[in-house]
A protein has these predicted regions:
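Conserved HGGG/HGGXW glycine-rich cap/lid loop of the alpha/beta-hydrolase fold
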Residues: 7-63
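Active-site loop/oxyanion-hole signature of alpha/beta-hydrolase fold enzymes
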Residues: 52-93
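Gly/Ala-rich beta-loop-alpha elbow adjacent to hydrolase catalytic centers
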Residues: 94, 98, 102
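Flexible "cap/lid" loop of the alpha/beta hydrolase fold
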Residues: 103, 107, 114-144
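Conserved alpha/beta-hydrolase catalytic His-Asp/Glu region
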Residues: 127, 148-196, 202-203
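Short beta-strand/loop motif that positions the catalytic acidic residue
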Residues: 207, 213-215
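Conserved alpha/beta-hydrolase "acid-adjacent" motif
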Residues: 220-226
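Catalytic histidine-centered segment of alpha/beta-hydrolase-like enzymes
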Residues: 244-257
Length: 265
């Protein structure tokens, strides 16, 4: 665990143990904070790669600059981290909002990315936008929690809740207690507003590295059609869907195995 200073901010990052397969840059999702355990550093990725993960601007133990944030800044932060670590090029995995940042990274700094994994994310623009999470901020905490669970997994309908009330209550309780560290509302909103303006659709055809696209079959945040739009636009890519919603990486154990195998191929 360490903090690196760039021109704009101090970035908090962590690495898993050294592995012969080399490093992998992991860019996490909305509201991510490495103090919440377990996280990507404890995933199957770290069995094969030296995973590098970091708190994005406004979150966790990274600086929280004044003013609005932009997707370009998020991408440049990732590139600056690589600069300070002395890494010229690296495989990158972006999940959800992190997938949007990864798209912007390969657009703005194409030479830094050797392979790209994009999970449960969207391109914006004509390729479709992810669910507007900023709209949930106007809801009460209970309403926001329930709505978030439902859009995370479209199988959770009102009918399902009626038939599985105990399981529903368990889901809500788990969601309430899952994250020890939560972002403050002001900086979270900055991230959500930047996310709202995300649009890399037209640049996807310029990506000249292999891309692995992964989605959840029941994801209401980054729906199937958004992943399919990216699949049609990116020249060299593979697309797979898994049993689960936005959290399919947890729900379907096959997903991480496929990611590792693809990265090693």
């Amino acid at each position: 665990m360490a903090i690196i200073s760039t021109k704009e901010l101090n970035i908090y990052f962590e690495k898993s143990e050294f592995k012969m397969n080399g490093p992998l840059l992991y860019i996490g999702g909305t509201g991510g904070d490495l103090r919440n355990r377990p996280n990507q550093l404890h995933s199957p990725l770290s069995d094969e790669f030296e995973v590098i993960a970091y708190d994005q601007r406004g979150l966790g133990q990274t600086s929280k600059p004044l003013g609005d944030y932009s997707m370009k800044q998020y991408a440049d932060d990732a590139a600056s981290l690589l600069d300070e670590l002395g890494i010229e090029t690296i495989p990158v995995m972006g999940v959800s909002f992190g997938g949007m940042v990864a798209q912007e990274l390969v657009k703005r700094h194409p030479s830094r990315v050797s392979k790209l994994v994009l999970a449960c994310t969207s391109s914006g623009g004509a390729g479709g936008a992810s669910y507007p999470l900023d709209e949930l901020e106007a809801l009460s905490e209970d309403e926001k929690l329930e709505r978030s669970i439902k859009i995370n997994d479209l199988r959770i309908t009102d009918r399902w809740i009626k038939d599985n009330i105990n399981a529903w209550n368990d889901l809500k309780n788990n969601a309430k207690t899952r994250l020890t560290y939560k972002p403050d509302s002001k900086n979270l909103l900055k991230q959500l507003i930047a996310r709202k303006g995300h649009n890399t659709y037209e640049s996807l055809s310029s990506i000249d590295v292999p891309v692995f696209l992964l989605g959840g079959k029941y994801d209401g945040i980054a729906p199937v059609e958004n992943m399919e739009s990216m699949h049609l636009k990116i020249i060299d890519n593979k697309l797979e869907f898994y049993e689960g919603g936005h959290l399919f990486l947890i729900q379907d154990k096959k997903a991480f195995k496929d990611i590792v195998n693809w990265l090693l191929s």
